[in-house]
Amino acid sequence: DGMRKSDADFLFVVSSVNFMLPHVGGGKVRANNKDDAWTVFYDEREKLINAWDKMDQPVFVLTGDLHNSFVCKITENVWEFASGPHNSNNHYYTDEGDRPANGKFKYGPREIDIRWSTHFRDDIPRDQLGSPHYCVVQINNVYNNPKQIGGTRWVAFPRPQVIFQYFDGWTGKLKYAEAVQATRD
């Protein structure tokens, strides 16, 4: 009820486990399915997505634990942003339901659009899968509109935006960014 009544421009939900991409392979740790996230609770997950999709503002599900970073557009109003790993090896794409690096993907009842991800083919030795990424979330609700060059005058955007920026953990270089505008004026 709190989310539904919120007057915030954006709603953020944090989950310690992934929401849309499965962890069905264990590789070195476990050879069989070790999926222990929202991807095994289809009914509950669909109820959440359907409720969030009816919100007046975008809903961002921030997740981790899958050992890869990715951005998934679940619906026009619901997104998943995952960041990691920070201190352990990445997973092969085969450990994650044979998902593509980007594009359409379906695991369970709902097709999603993977906008970007770290993605590792299974011909890479596991000890070479150390590719940490981190995500910086920036909310732009004002912009500088000075009356004189070099001045400062902050003006509110009619529709603020959130920018999710993914950086390489080794080099600090920007790898991907996704911007989402508020849906209501």
Regions found by a protein language model. Give the residues of each.
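Long, structured stretches of catalytic cores involved in phosphate-ester chemistry, encompassing
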Residues: D1-D185
